[in-house]
Amino acid sequence: MAKNTKEAALEYHSQGKPGKIEVVPTKPYSTQRDLSLAYSPGVAEPCLEIEKDSEAAYDYTAKGNLVAVISNGTAVLGLGDIGALAGKPVMEGKGLLFKIFAGIDVFDIEINEKDPEKFIQIVKGIADRKSVGRERV
C-alpha cells in the first residue's frame, strides 16, 4: 500500500544525510600542500589579487556560480508565515532545483527578522551590490 503524502514527504526529507544540499570541495585537499594552498598561507594570494581587482573574484572563487536563497519565512509556498527555520526545507528545495536544472550552487540563508525594512537592510549588508542582477559571460 502506498504511503500517504505526509509520510512519504517526511521519509524523503529524513532519509540518509539530513538536508537536500551540501558543500563539496572543487579543489584537491588530500595533501598538506593542498590544504596550505586552500587555506593558510596560500589563500592570501587570491585575496590580494581580489583586493587589487574585484573582478578577480570570478577567477579565484565560486562567486560566478553561487547564489543566496534568502528568506525570513513570512511567505512560504502557500504555508504563509511559518518562520525562518520552518521555511528552511523550502529554501533547500529551491537550492536543489537551481543545482540540478542550472548547475548553480546555492547557500540558503534564513533570517529571523519580520520587519521588512530591517530585513532589507540585513540582505543589503550581505549582498555585493556590484554583482546583484549581473551576469558574467
Say what each PLM segment does.
Residues 1-134:
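N-terminal ligand-binding/catalytic initiation module
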